[in-house]
Amino acid sequence: MQDKLIARAKELLAEGKVQKVVGWKKGLFDDDITPAVFTSAAELDKDFVFNKFCKANLSKYLVGITRQIEIAKSTTRMNNTMAKQRDPNAKDAPIPQEVVLVFLKPNDTYSFTQLLKENRITRGDVYAIGVPCQDTLDGGEVCETCKNKKPVSCDELIGVEAEPAPVQSTRMAEVEKLEAMTADERDAFWKNEFSRCLRCNACRDICPACTCERCVFDNNKLYTSQKVAETSFEESLFHIIRAWHVAGRCTDCGECSRVCPQHIPLYLLNRKFIKDINEIYGDYQAGSDMETKPAMLTFNAEGDPETTIVWERSKEREAE
């Protein structure tokens, strides 16, 4: 499979259809695989790998790459306009056209599609190829609770079926175990987990749903960027707020838990939100297609039993 991917990437580069390739690169050890950008056939032959250790979801890297592509286009257009103002006969500089090739496993394509829906990635700047997951070695958190092996929003598929057999997912089983606990038991569980947090921000930085250019947790004026938490409340604050911020947009890719150096099961927080959203608003899988409206960004006056709740509660506060 690795040879097929390299051959296809080299072919697209040679044809000029893509100018960059986002894939995986081997490090010092066989299991030390990291995302990488390739720009030539020689680089692909030397460093590109695809095996069971290629765990990283590559979709988020497209946010920064396509942003730079669009900035280059906008800068050229602006320069052309300014040149015309100085000299009406000035010739326009050609608008740079750059396309990046990315290899996405079925699970990763959901993150890619969700980013497209949120306009965080420009579709014309990306050529997406769906590749098989090969039951990636990830410690079990992702592949053992796979939600679907069907790739979405890809331009091409290599070694993966467009309509694979449905997956019998058991990913909500752990959430149900937490729900069966008493409030005190859940409180003790999460306090124990969050007490190990280093605030390294790895979960935020890897999360495809966390794409804000300026994060609230990097604000020194609000004292939200500190690394040391004085109380258990502060330890939980970061993770709970982040879970709220990605609610309805999290595709359950599992990257947050995969990169956590303390092995905190952060995916359980996100799955609890997903489970509640499905029960309250109906089945919804973020990133499953481009058409379905996000559950948390949709308002239906006919189906909302409390359409006047804001007005009524504001009146209650005024009366107090």
Q: What positions do the PLM features span?
A:
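Iron-sulfur-associated redox domains of electron-transfer enzymes in respiratory
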Residues: M1-W190, F194, P208
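Local cysteine-cluster metal-coordination motifs and their immediate loop/turn environment
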Residues: D108-Y110, G139-V152, S195-V216, G248-H263
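Ferredoxin-type iron-sulfur electron-transfer modules in oxidoreductases and energy-metabolism complexes
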Residues: R171-S195, C212-E320
